């Protein structure tokens, strides 16, 4: 008997069984595979970045609002200012001082919640757009290098600032591109050449 080798023609493709006919182990593997495929796709990356950015933005906004103890309620109207000064509907400094402590705490927490939600929306929106644009550029170029982040940062920054005029769009493009380049350089710095031996640091 002559040995004819082992090639791809001898391999039968896996049977694509319906999900209901799979064993529990096969269903778990299929579910994990579908989850990984979604997470590595452009819509999945955009969704994950948006949710992560929303959470981080909320924490950041809450922290910044809690540190603004010297200017409560952002920029409240000074004592004796007209009715149109400061935040509409916000009490003045004198009015805040005259309120009971419980009411002051309630107003401050409401303001912190508004600032945290606003920051969360901005961070989530930026993260979702940037991740989606970068994934699309990477898919079109079929390359994973530094230029994807630069182009995505420029398009994201310019797109978010285009309503303010060409100058603002150009500044936003340059700023986001520089920031994304710095982050990519830092993240890729660990992927340099390995040391010549185990003793090189």
Curated annotation (Swiss-Prot):
Disulfide bonds: 42-135, 154-173
GO CC, one annotated term: TIM22 mitochondrial import inner membrane insertion complex
Topology versus the membrane: Multi-pass membrane protein
GO biological process, one term: protein insertion into mitochondrial inner membrane
Transmembrane segments: 47-67, 146-162, 167-187
GO molecular function: mitochondrion targeting sequence binding; protein transmembrane transporter activity; structural molecule activity
Predominant cellular place of this UniProt entry's protein: mitochondrion
Compartments reported by the entry: Mitochondrion inner membrane
Keyword annotations of the record: Disulfide bond, Membrane, Mitochondrion, Mitochondrion inner membrane, Protein transport, Translocation, Transmembrane, Transmembrane helix, Transport
Family to which this protein belongs: Belongs to the Tim17/Tim22/Tim23 family.
Function field: Essential core component of the TIM22 complex, a complex that mediates the import and insertion of multi-pass transmembrane proteins into the mitochondrial inner membrane. In the TIM22 complex, it constitutes the voltage-activated and signal-gated channel. Forms a twin-pore translocase that uses the membrane potential as external driving force in 2 voltage-dependent steps.
Assembly mode: Component of the TIM22 complex, whose core is composed of TIM22 and TIM54, associated with the 70 kDa heterohexamer composed of TIM9 and TIM10 (or TIM8 and TIM13).
Annotated protein name in UniProt: Mitochondrial import inner membrane translocase subunit TIM22
Species in which this protein is naturally found: Eremothecium gossypii (strain ATCC 10895 / CBS 109.51 / FGSC 9923 / NRRL Y-1056)
Lineage: Eukaryota, Fungi, Dikarya, Ascomycota, Saccharomycotina
